[in-house]
């Protein structure tokens, strides 16, 4: 009976909390509408004009972001939004779509945006300041709980803050509502709740 069965693509939005303590979680589908990835010698190449989200999902996303009453917006996708250098799946494989995404954030200016991603077998936190956005955007990448790329010790990411985590890990967001504006503690943790990376963000 899920309404997702009535649409193309598995994207959805969910709002939690009430009043001035609302969190909107937006889950994007980065596979259903995506054009095939381009490879040369096994390495993904930028597709400058390729479709990524599909127009219906773009329209829906703009609607969810425009005049949203939420104080924090958590936007998740299976692949990384911000990192550009890594050679695997990422939004940067579709540069036009990546620009469009950050331009949409700058246009709608939703408060408290935090990006979530995975599918890398590493953990890291990235930060990026899009043109026209009043504050920098942070992305938490965490994966995985059962497998980790322990050999990955020096992957380039000009946007990374803190270390790369090449051990089993999970991501955690803690929201502090006691301040005039919400403060979010972004963390990557591991076994026995060990904290590998922690970054406090105010909006």
Predicted stretch roles:
Residues 1-203:
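Long, structured stretches of catalytic cores involved in phosphate-ester chemistry, encompassing
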